[in-house]
Regions:
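Amphipathic, interaction-prone secondary-structure segments
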Residues: 32-50
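Charged, amphipathic alpha-helical segments and their flanking helix caps
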Residues: 1-28, 46-147
Length: 147
């Protein structure tokens, strides 16, 4: 079983990343290489609602950064990249519908995993290298028992 929430999140996303791009998930680092996917932490244990002597509803925020080839031509490369990133968002939504969640520590019960937007952001381009970064912002909402 993973030791921390960070371990759980990496273990949760890594099989999907390997399936999609045949490479490991980068953690808190987004490489300048096409077809790379990074997991970037935003915040953890943010309290949404506190229950005295019971625990708290909390959230774990993160971003998925997808680096794809970028084109300044009138081809469909950028559209294909956007559709790839959108499909990753759709996969996150599907996992929530199936209630297939990361394996957080025993004192935590996940309520949902969700995208915080309805489409990926074009987070930046490197025209010289022909790369674009697409960002998906997400969160896990969970209940953590007081220990």
């Amino acid at each position: 079983m993973p030791v921390t929430k960070h371990d759980a999140m990496k273990a949760y996303f890594e099989p999907k990343v390997i399936e999609l791009v045949g490479d490991l998930l980068s953690f808190n680092f987004s490489p300048e290489s096409p077809d790379s996917i990074a997991f970037v932490t935003n915040y953890s244990d943010k309290v949404l609602k506190k229950y005295i002597r019971i625990g708290a509803e909390k959230e774990y925020g993160f971003s998925i950064i997808i680096t794809k080839a970028y084109s300044t031509s009138a081809d469909d490369l950028n559209l294909e990249a956007m559709n790839f990133a959108q499909a990753f968002m759709d996969w996150v939504d599907e996992q929530d519908r199936k209630k297939d969640y990361p394996d957080f520590p025993d004192h935590c019960q996940i309520k949902k995993i969700e995208n915080l937007q309805n489409m990926p952001n074009l987070a930046g381009i490197n025209a010289k290298e022909g790369l674009a970064r697409y960002m998906l912002q997400c969160r896990v909402v969970y209940f953590e028992k007081e220990r």
